[in-house]
Amino acid sequence: MVKGRQGERVRLYVRGTILGYKRSKSNQYPNTSLVQIEGVNTQEEVNWYKGKRMAYIYKAKTKKNGSHYRCIWGKVTRPHGNSGVVRAKFTSNLPPKSMGSRVRVFMYPSNI
């Protein structure tokens, strides 16, 4: 018999929002995405997240490996501007439907 969970649930990631692709006035560069991490508002705070892994999790119609959920992994590469936005590169370019959706920014690999 399994006992109920004791205490509060612990989240091992920070939520982020996908803002869009890196772009100039007339071109966009879909191999780099812009992500706003919750609670990060300055360029100095972004430095802790450099190199951290992130995952865009989405639901698909057909099952693969017994699950409808799939994941695109990425990595925080550098800050973008002064307001806490980061640039991230993903293993494959994010689909356009991902704009405005959530991403999980994990606390590893640690660089302490």
UniProtKB/Swiss-Prot annotation:
**GO MF assignments:** mRNA binding; structural constituent of ribosome
Q: Which GO terms describe its biological process?
A: translation
Q: Does this UniProt record's set of keywords contain Ribosomal protein?
A: yes
What UniProt keywords apply to this chain's record, in alphabetical order? Ribonucleoprotein, Ribosomal protein
Q: Does the keyword Ribosomal protein apply?
A: yes
For this record, an example GO cellular component is: mitochondrion
The entry assigns this protein to a family as follows: Belongs to the eukaryotic ribosomal protein eL33 family.
Q: Which PANTHER family match?
A: 60S RIBOSOMAL PROTEIN L35A (PTHR10902)
Which HAMAP family does this chain map to?
Answer: Ribosomal_eL33 (MF_00573)
Protein name per Swiss-Prot or TrEMBL: Large ribosomal subunit protein eL33y
Which gene is this protein's source? RPL35AC
